[in-house]
Amino acid sequence: MRKLFLSLAIMTGIATSYAQQKLVLYYSENGTTKTVAEEIQKQLGADIEAVEAVEPYTGDFQATIQRGNKERANGQWPAIKPLKKDMSKYDVIFLGYPIWFGTYANPIVTLLNGQDFAGKTIVPFCTFGSGGLNTSTANLKKALPKAKIAQGYGVRTARVAKAA
């Protein structure tokens, strides 16, 4: 797991800037993204918080696909629980999510729509079975035009399981 974090730190160059306030903010349905988030948090000494859906997904792949497709088709994103952390206190946000439908998971859409990320540096990291980081990073840039989107890191789910 340390190799995964070191790759992220080298790619972003942000991990060495200790003056900045950092938050690891992530959504994880089955624990894979949480594993990566916790390693980043541990290595950086950053604060950490999970994004949680009010109505959790079941963890069943087919049920998640069915529900996720319906949410996307209707543009009705899942409600999320209020964050406990005050986002205004952070300069750098490591934003983690699994890849769903080629981009970030639906609860992240709700998060992006409900928070002010202006002036923040966002470092995306994702876990995926197929697909990867590029499309979700491009979508983050569109969704958060007033934030700086740094180069992020994508890791295959199978690689996280082996490293844990």
Segments predicted by a language model, with ranges:
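FMN-binding flavodoxin-like domain, especially the glycine-rich phosphate-binding loop
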Residues: 8-12, 19-54, 66-67, 72-97, ...
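Positively charged n-region of N-terminal signal peptides that target proteins for export
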Residues: 1-4
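Hydrolase active-site cap/lid region
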Residues: 58-66
